Amino acid sequence: MKKIWLIVLAVTGLLILTVAGFVVRDGATVTPVGEGTITLEAGTFEAFPLPQFAAKHISEDYKSYFVEVEPGIKVHVLEVGSGFPVFVQHGNPTSGFLYRKVAEELPKDRVRLIMPTMVGLGFSSKVPASSHTVANHMRWINTVLNQLQLSELVYSGQDWGGPVGMGALSLSPGLIKGAVMLNTGFGAPTRAANLSIPHAVVKIPLLGELLLEVFFPIFDGMGRLQGDPDQYTADVAELYGKPVVDSGNAKAPLAMMRMVPDGPDHPSSPAMRAVANYVESLDIPAEIVWGMRDPILALGLPGMKRFFPDAPVTETQGGHFLQEEVPAEIAVALLRVVDQVQASRGDSQ
């Protein structure tokens, strides 16, 4: 009998190790495939017809296409409008669709809104968890901007879209002419510190995978980060979550949470410090629009003011994904900055 129990325990242990190994696997590269092409001033790109569950959220005048930033790694880009380029960068775990309501508030004849989706999220390529680094994401988004042959732009970013967007621009420092900063942050902690309790918990190996990928999928809980949780509907959860889950590689949300530096020696810290130094060097028209009901980054407003001490600040009742809740306030700020940029060069319309 004792021998039987030992065999049972051994088999059980082997099964547990097998399951654990599967859960914490690095994940594979998943390359999406488009259909046809789309021609822009910068050249011809691979078109990506949107599935109905996503297409229903935007108007028919949007362009949807891929920019291949490395062999097998494609960034999905949405854009709408014509006029002065405005590059907007989302963060974790959303996609370029996060700015769709902002787009509705902007005059399409004055602004060309460019909305890339970070690798690993939305309809962009999925990559192994180990490939999610600040430096990689900066380089990938910078490659998008370069392939679109942009010579100037106004920028806005939120969550990881702050460091990644500004980081991408730091690699082509002449591009940015103005900015509207949303809930995000720059730099790295000078001592051990976690951004939030969830960030501290999910960085624990295996526990993070079990929590975010098995028991409590991150896309189902995003409403808790909003000023009005009821605005985060099942349709919106599907918009952000379905492309990631259906791809077979849903590693990005957890990997991006683990990218957040928790001290000066974190792997992300050198890149984050470099981005902060770049932001400090900027002398551009800027505004800040902040969601004061953001449970993660609301308290980061004073820090953002230090980077842009002369920027007008609009405090809102939005939560973490404030683009979903206060798009009009963001759009108005973007237009004011675009007007300032154009006026400064003498071509205000």
Which stretches of residues belong to each language-model region?
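C-terminal-most transmembrane helix of multi-pass membrane proteins
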Residues: 86, 331-333, 337, 345
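Conserved HGGG/HGGXW glycine-rich cap/lid loop of the alpha/beta-hydrolase fold
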Residues: 73, 78-123
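Catalytic histidine-centered segment of alpha/beta-hydrolase-like enzymes
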Residues: 319-331
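Flexible "cap/lid" subdomain of the alpha/beta-hydrolase fold that forms the substrate-access gate
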Residues: 15-64, 75, 98, 121-156, ...
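N-terminal Sec-pathway targeting helices
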Residues: 1-14
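Short hydrophobic "strand-cap" motifs at the C-terminus of beta-strands
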Residues: 89-90, 289, 318-319
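Alpha/beta-hydrolase-fold serine-hydrolase catalytic core, especially in secreted/extracellular enzymes
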Residues: 342-349
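Short acidic-hydrophobic surface loop/beta-edge motif
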Residues: 65-70
